[in-house]
Amino acid sequence: APGAGVDLSRIPGMSEHAYLMRTVGDAMKLRAAIISRMEEANLITKHQQRKEMLSFVVVGGGYSGVETAGQIQDLIAGVRRYYDNIREDEATVTLIHSGDRLLSMLGERLGDYTGRCLEKMGVKIVFNKRVRAVTARTVQLSDGTTIPTNLVVRASS
């Protein structure tokens, strides 16, 4: 599978700035971090600053990455009503995958279907790009694109 065996911890900044998604404990820490970002963003008055605070990036288009991106999107949708100052378009979840199809090990139809479902939920998917570096506020991709973000999840090996 594309990306299989890639050691994401060797990407500059990944170990320092990204949340790991492997255990239930990791999931609980991630949930708390997302809620914390929502709380903080609700106090920010400037739209662009709220958008940057609420930009979440998931790296990895396998089982864990797909599930994590969908769950983050669901969590945001479920709690947004408690935050009067956060508009629907301000929170974004971006899934970055080095291959051309999600869940490639399951075949073309299921991978494409999964991608359509995530996009319908509001998850933005970036295909055929690798993460080159992660900082506290950005993810830099192999094509030179920089994605502003406040939280990165490493949902791959």
Residue ranges and their predicted role:
Residues A1-V57, L75, V153:
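FAD-binding core/adjacent interface of flavoenzyme oxidoreductases
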Residues M14-S15, V59, K120, S142:
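Alpha-helical hydrophobic/aromatic positions enriched in membrane-embedded helices and signal peptides
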Residues V59-G62, G99:
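Glycine-rich Rossmann-fold phosphate-binding loop(s) that bind the pyrophosphate
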Residues G65-V66:
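N-terminal Rossmann-fold NAD(P) dinucleotide-binding loop
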Residues A69:
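Glycine-rich loop/hinge motif
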Residues Q73-S157:
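A Rossmann-like FAD-binding core segment of flavoenzymes
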